[in-house]
Curated annotation (Swiss-Prot):
GO terms for biological process: mitochondrial electron transport, NADH to ubiquinone; mitochondrial respiratory chain complex I assembly. The chain crosses the membrane at residues 1-21, 24-44, 46-66, 86-106, 149-169. It comes from Dugong dugon. Belongs to the complex I subunit 6 family. Core subunit of respiratory chain NADH dehydrogenase (Complex I) which is composed of 45 different subunits. InterPro entries: ComplexI_Subunit6 (IPR050269), NADH_UbQ/plastoQ_OxRdtase_su6 (IPR001457), Nuo/plastoQ_OxRdtase_6_NuoJ (IPR042106). One of its GO terms (cellular component) is mitochondrial inner membrane. One of its GO terms (molecular function) is NADH dehydrogenase (ubiquinone) activity. This is NADH-ubiquinone oxidoreductase chain 6. The gene is MT-ND6. Core subunit of the mitochondrial membrane respiratory chain NADH dehydrogenase (Complex I) which catalyzes electron transfer from NADH through the respiratory chain, using ubiquinone as an electron acceptor. Essential for the catalytic activity and assembly of complex I. It comes from the Eukaryota. Its EC number is 7.1.1.2. It catalyses: a ubiquinone + NADH + 5 H(+)(in) = a ubiquinol + NAD(+) + 4 H(+)(out).
Length: 175
């Protein structure tokens, strides 16, 4: 289980390296869709089957529609591949080397610590109880943590969506 999640995490980062070094919108969108699918797989492997399925259906379904429209509008007759430009190829190889160095560091015994993460005790989380057994459901824990511990993240996300509406209106106003 740990190695499966680790391999999916590496694929997740490699997909975003492909997005950040995109030579053409087609390949950037492909890397984003692949990373989104792997991210949903990571959520499912940690027990969030409902959340992973919803993110997969909503996020990737909407992304595929946007990806289809952008590739139709920005079709290049000869799209630039990752190896066609030395700068783009260097960015891709550099990102992959950094990811490889991180993997080697983690397997050699170096560890990562979460700094400043204090979740308190588990009595506030949703617990299903029976006779002598209790079960903490990860789907509900993730949703409740998003709105309680990540409240400023939700506020900032809403504010960014609100501002992006005005940016889109301003960009398309003159046409």
């Amino acid at each position: 289980m740990m190695y499966t999640v680790f391999v999916m995490s590496v694929l997740f980062v490699v997909g975003f390296v492909g997005v950040s070094s995109k030579p053409s919108p087609v390949y950037g969108g492909l890397g984003l869709v692949a990373s989104g699918g792997v991210g949903c797989g990571i959520v499912v492997s940690f027990g969030g089957s409902f959340l992973g399925l919803m993110v997969f259906l909503v996020y990737l379904g909407g992304m595929m529609v946007v990806f289809g429209y952008t590739t139709a509008m920005a079709t290049d007759e000869y799209p630039e591949a990752w190896g066609s430009n030395i700068v783009v190829l260097g960015a891709l190889v550099g990102g992959l080397l950094m990811e490889g160095a991180a993997v080697v560091y983690l397997f050699s015994g170096g560890g990562l610590e979460l700094v400043g993460l204090d979740l308190g005790s588990l009595e506030n989380w949703m617990v299903f109880g029976g006779e002598g057994e209790e079960l903490i459901r990860e789907d509900y824990v993730g949703g409740s943590s998003l709105y309680s511990y990540g409240c400023w993240f939700m506020v900032m996300s809403g504010w960014m969506l609100f501002i992006s509406v005005f940016i889109v209106i301003e960009v398309t106003r003159g046409r």
